[in-house]
């Protein structure tokens, strides 16, 4: 039995659903294959979406025409804006998800999508001929043909769950692992690494004494990830904060020899920025306590996620540890935490489109590329789906620059630098983070999403109207002069500012740190009716104009380097002046531009100068 598609997506987690939807929405006939249809967009770890950097990725996914933002807006139990006391570059939205509702909503979306077929089945091998992918074969012998395949296998590849001294084959949440496909990828020559992640225990809400914890409510203001959301969930559930203590740490110390992390049973590299409680105890032994957040997993379940207590200690030790924590003395553990090891490919084997260098038409996205996190997976899935469909349909491929999106930073880091541990996106990884803000994702990316075929005409028209409104309001404030009358002076002094000596343009008054848009406009006779999102942009663009201009100047310098393309047929062995390490790294990564080459670890400025001279002199030796 054979069926033919344009694009096949293997897996239906957070990367898979975005890849499948993007491909189908671009007009490619798409098939999504998944081990279990009941686990579409499942959240095996924390029941949340967003946070620092990650929340901005969710906004970017939405601006490009992806799905994650819309789904979490419909299914969250709480939403909070983080870092509101800091500058706009680090503000980010975070939502607690109703994980079951999130799954159900996402499954409904993919089931209703035109051009997208969904099938339960386990892929065991790729069909490859002359270095090009032709399709996939399942464990029951069914063959599906396609011109492009996107692998979004998550932590299922040779997945193994570890709990104390027990280790067994399993995908996340004790699902069936993918063994044969993992072996197949090794057989066809991919470099594979072994990574590890983990999850904490879940406890019954009725067994928690919340009076001993600190309430963590959601924001009172309506919040949303998607620019299209108009209905907001105001009936929110709180989370709760408690702490470990000396007694907790004593239980860990007494049983550290039983932890798979320290017994030698776990061989995979774990995530630096999401350590287990054992790891935190060992690495930060001077800390008297560690934060523990109690997060409801949904509105219709008693399960509470014990965030901060990820562990691979035996089940009885986990329960003993829980009972030392204030509020959890009588905790009823419903699920034990565990560690999971899995295979991932070395991501420098990918082009920036997420197509593999080894096999034409084969793309990978999500944790198979060495990342951690639902948001990082979804962003990659979206880009892989766009590019797989573009390849088949003859459209232009899409590569986002580091100055355009956190998704661009993420993918460039992976394919240029690689990673020796599960990669987590951080604001500190973005050198242009003032340009990559939560508030301006639509201004950065909606045009790109429209050109890629994922943004409809109605939304694109609204976006253009918003852009025009921002420009018009900045121009208006640049022409209105505010007099130093009693009302003006009183307003400025009440906000801790220095009184005016003379009249001032409204736009210049807005630049003062103590003034905001509302207070400036209150001093103008013709106030106008301006949308809140437009007000926000006018204020940020005005107050941070100098810093933004500096960032844009830096971007222009980088763009000049990006425009210096490295010919595909370059032979690095022919450039004798290159350092040996630089030559090896350049041959491995195969950078597309001088800028990308300069970001490779082990390639220094002297090597870049040599490479530039070689290219500019036209000394390109064709590779046989």
From Swiss-Prot:
Keyword tRNA processing in record: yes
UniProt cofactor(s): FAD
Biological processes per GO annotation: tRNA methylation; tRNA wobble uridine modification
Cystine residue pairs: none
Localization: Cytoplasm
tRNA processing found in the keyword field: yes
Keywords: Cytoplasm, FAD, Flavoprotein, NAD, tRNA processing
GO molecular function per UniProt: flavin adenine dinucleotide binding
Principal cellular location given in the protein's record: cytoplasm
GO cellular component, one term: cytosol
Annotated NAD(+) binding sites: 270-284
Entry-linked Pfam families: GIDA (PF01134), GIDA_C_1st (PF21680), SAM_GIDA_C (PF13932)
Residues that coordinate or bind FAD: 11-16, 123, 178, 367
Function as written in the Swiss-Prot or TrEMBL entry: NAD-binding protein involved in the addition of a carboxymethylaminomethyl (cmnm) group at the wobble position (U34) of certain tRNAs, forming tRNA-cmnm(5)s(2)U34.
Quaternary structure note: Homodimer. Heterotetramer of two MnmE and two MnmG subunits.
Entry similarity comment: Belongs to the MnmG family.
Protein name: tRNA uridine 5-carboxymethylaminomethyl modification enzyme MnmG
Gene behind this protein: mnmG
